[in-house]
């Protein structure tokens, strides 16, 4: 017989025992699930140069997580070395980590953060062999050229798509149009596209605007999630993305320019965000577009101060990028070059020009500096930004001018990013709409591909400029003024001749406007050549022009006309 109080005690003990059992069982289940999850992650196979992503949830409450909270992961690579990579906020309480592994074996990471939900999170995966090549880097042993991360030489062949990640209804620019554009360009051999992450016309995308307010640093994750989708598609088509985080404000009206952040720390925070979010893709970074514009539009600043600030922003981006992607910066037309940044520890390019004049010479001027040299803006085929029916950009008024400009650059050992009026700005600054299928572009698309196909058939990275080994009766001419109906534009020289050589093995001569004999010297100690082929850069047609005999010391040849021609001499 039990007293009333004893019955209550027995009932409570029974209930406590049941509750404890349930708690114990739940804890066991959680432990097993955690172990199972960890096992799944440990067994997750990720391609070498592939893409690993994992998510975590913060438990704290923050007014502005993008600004108020930081998180990073210490990554232990298979060789025992460690790198630190930032996590990025992706909306609500979600934080993500992205890694593109470059070494085979087991990778581990440990998250550090002031947030209890993030701090101490761990994970691992196994990097396995793949056919992926990775992003790009300066080629070891050939500093002015590119290679994939796996060491395969990379013939950088670019196109401009400043609005690749935005939408604009009036220009019929959206994700589907961008996919079609990428498909077309990939089929034409394009392997690089550089683009704005913050579009200077102020466009958003289907996710909305990039920031609700730049002054308050209220970032909109949905906008960046749409960029993720398009960038992944771009990479899947074999194209490297050149990403410009923001533009200089050259008109004081651009809604997402660098100057609109509240200060340097905000600019650096944004740079770190971009590195964390996009460094695992096949990309390179351009710290700013037209950086000189910030000098124009900020009161009481000097060029030196703005340059120092962009070096700091570049430092923040580079130091936050555990993948060590290439980094450059982009000038305004008046300056043309960014050689002044070659002392910055992050500068990976010998130059990243926007230049429309003296194209060949200005590539050569940058060769004393290490790193590949790119002219990233030298012409936009048939661009008509004021819609008056007439082209308004230098070198852009004909396929001939674009072709001459392109060959003048590559014959100095430089690389090109071309562009088309109908696509380079998403249809903006052209009559529009965004249209990769405009038949007017066909001729330049074909001729741009001809140059790429020719160079890719050679060990182009071994060719060095030797313009002093090619001679003609008259000197090379200068850039020419071309009169259109209502304006005069600059075009490449009418008469010129250039030579690239791997002495004793290969000689590539490009010439135009010649009416007589050109002479190519083979250089000291060369044994001569026994093969001479002629390329028509307008059509891609090639033919042999020697008689099978060895040509020693020098080669003399007269062009059939004053059009441009390419000679390839080899043994």
How would you label these PLM feature ranges?
Residues 1-21:
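N-terminal secretory signal peptides that target proteins for export/translocation
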Residues 43-47, 61, 71, 383, ...:
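Aromatic- and carboxylate-lined catalytic core of secreted/periplasmic carbohydrate-active enzymes
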Residues 43-79, 85, 124-129, 491, ...:
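Non-catalytic, glycine-rich low-complexity segments
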Residues 96-100, 519-521, 552-559:
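Exposed aromatic-hydrophobic patches
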